[in-house]
Regions:
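Thiamine diphosphate
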Residues: 1-113, 117, 120-212
Length: 212
C-alpha cells in the first residue's frame, strides 16, 4: 500500500517512470497537489531536458478539481491553471466518462508527464463508455455544438453548463458554439480562434479563479 504521503507517492512515481515503467499515481484531492510540487515541477517536468533527452518521465498524475458538498476550503480548490503554467507538464480536463477514458489512455502512452484533473461533481454521473480501445488526441478540441453568434469555451463539468446555456440561448434565437478544449496544455488554439473569428464573441466558462 502507498503511504498517505503525496510527496512520497509522487517521488516513487517519478523514479518508476525514469526506470521504464508508466505509473499512474492518484492524489485524492487536487488541493494537495501543492505537496508534490517539488517532484512534479523540479523533477518530472525537467528531467528529460536536463538529461539532454536521454531520460523520459512517462508519469500520469490523476487528481481532481472543484468544490463538492461538505468539503472544507482546502478540499474545494481548482488548481489546474496553476499547474498548466509549469513548463514540461501536460494538463487534461475530461468533461465526461467517455473523455476521461480516452484521455487517460492517451496520457499513459505519452512519454511526458501528464496531469489529469477530474471534476468532483461528475463522480456520480453515469454514462456509457465503449469497452473497445480508443484514444483521444491531446491538443484537439471538441466542438460540442456549432453556432454563429457566440463562442462558449468550457472546461471539465462546465461543458455541461455551457451546453444547457446554449439550449436556452437557442430559444432566444441566439446560436452559440460550444467548444471543449479537452486539454489546456497543449491547447488547440486554432479551433478556438477560428470559432471566435466566426462568431466575434467569446465567453470562457471555467472553475478556476477569474483574476490573480
Amino acid at each position: 500500500d502507498s503511504p498517505i504521503s503525496e510527496a512520497g507517492i509522487a517521488g516513487m512515481g517519478v523514479g518508476a517512470a525514469m526506470t521504464g515503467m508508466r505509473p499512474v499515481i492518484d492524489i485524492m484531492f487536487g488541493d494537495f497537489s501543492t505537496l508534490v510540487m517539488e517532484q512534479m515541477v523540479n523533477q518530472a517536468a525537467k528531467i528529460h531536458y536536463m538529461s539532454g533527452g536521454k531520460l523520459n518521465v512517462p508519469l500520469v498524475l490523476r487528481t481532481n478539481l472543484g468544490a463538492t458538498r461538505r468539503s472544507a476550503a482546502q478540499h474545494s480548490q481548482s488548481l489546474h491553471a496553476l499547474v498548466a503554467h509549469i513548463p514540461g507538464l501536460k494538463v487534461a480536463l475530461p468533461s465526461s466518462a467517455y473523455e476521461a477514458k480516452g484521455l487517460m489512455k492517451t496520457a499513459i502512452r505519452d512519454n511526458n508527464p501528464v496531469v489529469i484533473f477530474e471534476d468532483k461533481l461528475m463522480y456520480n454521473d453515469k454514462a456509457p463508455v465503449p469497452e473497445e480501445e480508443y484514444l483521444i488526441p491531446f491538443g484537439e478540441a471538441n466542438v460540442k455544438r456549432e453556432g454563429t453568434d457566440i463562442t462558449l469555451i468550457a472546461t471539465s463539468s462546465m461543458v455541461q453548463v455551457a451546453e444547457k446555456a446554449a439550449e436556452l440561448l437557442a430559444q432566444e434565437g441566439i446560436e452559440a458554439e460550444v467548444i471543449d478544449p479537452r486539454t489546456i496544455v497543449p491547447l488547440d488554439e486554432k479551433t478556438l480562434l477560428d470559432s471566435v473569428k466566426k462568431t466575434s464573441r467569446a465567453i470562457v466558462i471555467d472553475e478556476g479563479h477569474q483574476s490573480y
